[in-house]
Amino acid sequence: MPVSRNTLQPVPDKWNAFYCRLSRDDDNEGDSNSILHQKQILERYARDHGIKQYRYYVDDGYSGTNFNRPGFKEMLADIEGGHVKAVIVKDMSRFGRNYLEVGMYTEIRFPELDVRFVAINDGVDSEDQSGNEFTPFRNIINETYP
């Protein structure tokens, strides 16, 4: 296991990616979508599911229709590098609001790379296909209702 140069602590080879995003428009809705609120939901999920190794990727002030976001790109680089075992978000709209692009990642790219995808509040978990039949419809709604 590699060691972090900054802390001399072991760095896990694989971790869970906790992704948070807040656009300027979402900010008008108050604390319900705030980055802090998203992190609280993700941390509760981690506790409830015994997840110990995770890393946050955050894009504050970026639209979900734009996938050229710094935190998102950093997460993708870590996924492509084989370091991420799961991407976990508060809900599908936090991941993105472009139906085709979201579907490309969640339905094609992540499965190709053996990366699990979880959207907590939407009940989406790529390991449990029984609850995922409405995921494409959620993506369409998220795209049309920013």
Label every PLM stretch briefly.
Residues 1-146:
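Short, structured surface patches at the beginning of a domain
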